[in-house]
Amino acid sequence: MSRIGKLPIEVPKGVTVTFVDSVLTVKGPKGELCRTIMPEVSVAVEDGKISVTRPDDAIKSRSAHGLTRTLVNNMVVGVTAGYQTDLEINGVGYRAEVKGAELVLSLGYSHPVVFPLPSGITVEVDKMTKLAVKGIDKELVGQTAAKIRSFRGPEPYKGKGIKYATETILRKAGKTGKK
């Protein structure tokens, strides 16, 4: 048995879970998420708990067991608490602002970078240098944060660019002059 896959998922109050035709739908106070479950595993919803089981010990079933359980748990946590990833912008003149459904970034290029926000994602800007990417879908929040970071990743000499708030940048020493 998968150590992660065998654990049941508690369904909190205010959350409804339905499983019809290999599509799992989780509704909660923050929204609704749907996911197609792989045919290698089966999901059962009973007594306020969700359990993920596999029919056999085939390699594909074993690899999908823990993954499916974690994905379902992420859905339950997302519709109750939501997810947030924090980013920081370092550099002279580097800033961000939200205009409608777009994030406008000034990152030292000759033009501002305009990033349309996916539906279900909100970005809060604090002091033009701190971003908070929020949403109920953990995968989409992480993917959006990674895309924003990729516009100007942190460089190792001065540390300029966009980085995760928890990330530490390994700094390099610059060139030494001729002596």
Curated annotation (Swiss-Prot):
Keywords: Ribonucleoprotein, Ribosomal protein, RNA-binding, rRNA-binding
Cellular component per GO, a single term: cytosolic large ribosomal subunit
GO molecular function: rRNA binding; structural constituent of ribosome
Gene3D superfamilies named in the record: Ribosomal protein L6, alpha-beta domain (3.90.930.12)
A Pfam family of this chain: Ribosomal_L6
GO BP terms: cytoplasmic translation
Protein family according to the UniProt entry: Belongs to the universal ribosomal protein uL6 family.
PANTHER family noted in UniProt: 60S/50S RIBOSOMAL PROTEIN L6/L9, LARGE RIBOSOMAL SUBUNIT PROTEIN UL6M
Annotated function: This protein binds to the 23S rRNA, and is important in its secondary structure. It is located near the subunit interface in the base of the L7/L12 stalk, and near the tRNA binding site of the peptidyltransferase center.
Assembly behavior: Part of the 50S ribosomal subunit.
Name of the protein described by the UniProt record: Large ribosomal subunit protein uL6
